[in-house]
């Protein structure tokens, strides 16, 4: 099965806090990709797994009587680790690649995910909502494959 990791803006770069509505954006993208026949690795699910792991850390709970809170690095590392099982990388609208350079206005997490996709040799695809119908799905970034390659097994 075709497995795609979806990436997109989570952090509001002006506040440093999670962007309002980020989870719904990822869930909508996942639903669309599943309809296209993909197995999807979604950061929303990874975040829940990380939080569950920390809530179930009984040693820490016994010592402190409070659950340990995951750090930003914990979330990012978990996402990067899960990318290793994917054969495609899809970026949501709002993540920009300019030529071979990652745009400076992206969060550290997205920058690292794009670099990891490159290291793993994953084709990088971009979702585009501006000027295209939503059901058009994913389009490739210039130089990173063709839509036919994305859709074939």
Language model: regions and residue ranges:
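Conserved catalytic or regulatory cores that recognize and/or transform ribose-phosphate-containing ligands
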Residues: 1-153
